[in-house]
Amino acid sequence: MAAPSGGWNGVGASLWAALLLGAVALRPAEAVSEPTTVAFDVRPGGVVHSFSHNVGPGDKYTCMFTYASQGGTNEQWQMSLGTSEDHQHFTCTIWRPQGKSYLYFTQFKAEVRGAEIEYAMAYSKAAFERESDVPLKTEEFEVTKTAVAHRPGAFKAELSKLVIVAKASRTEL
């Protein structure tokens, strides 16, 4: 949308700015549908646990979080999944809403089914109140077409958040 040409006084320019902002605010959302968020417990004890959830038409996409951790007591974590309006992209975010986890993770892996990863990031600390996300060093984790996982020997046992953006897998005829 371009501004009409011609002379503008302060009132006309303000009116045009208000109309432009209104048009932007009222346009249909194009990004992600309303996400589904599910809570789950991350349990210490060194045993491998998994949690998964599906999203999309016909539960087209799956996000699975597999981990083993040591330390204190259970922590409540969340998994949020959403799809683009055309259902060609999906997001999976796994995180501890209280920010930093106090558990020591001996391993982790977040996998997607029905899609291929376009972007993934792992964080040692999740944003909470006035603090920002703190990403893991790239040498601590690896990303494949379908998973983000710890790198044995390089991962420093701190994990508080994982973010994945994936695109629908192409189906060949």
Swiss-Prot record:
Signal keyword on record: yes
Record's function text: Bone marrow-derived monocyte and paracrine-acting protein that promotes cardiac myocyte survival and adaptive angiogenesis for cardiac protection and/or repair after myocardial infarction (MI). Stimulates endothelial cell proliferation through a MAPK1/3-, STAT3- and CCND1-mediated signaling pathway. Inhibits cardiac myocyte apoptosis in a PI3K/AKT-dependent signaling pathway. Involved in endothelial cell proliferation and angiogenesis.
Gene induction: Up-regulated in response to myocardial infarction (MI).
Tissues in which the UniProt entry reports expression: Expressed in eosinophils (at protein level). Expressed in bone marrow cells. Expressed in synovial tissue. Found in synovial fluid of patients with arthropaties.
GO cellular component, one term: endoplasmic reticulum-Golgi intermediate compartment
Family: Belongs to the MYDGF family.
Protein name per its UniProtKB record: Myeloid-derived growth factor
Signal peptide start and end residues: 1-31
Compartments where found: Secreted; Endoplasmic reticulum-Golgi intermediate compartment; Endoplasmic reticulum; Golgi apparatus
InterPro entries: MYDGF
GO biological process annotation, one example: apoptotic process
One Pfam assignment: UPF0556
Protein keywords: Angiogenesis, Apoptosis, Endoplasmic reticulum, Golgi apparatus, Secreted, Signal
Organism: Homo sapiens
Source taxon at top rank: Eukaryota
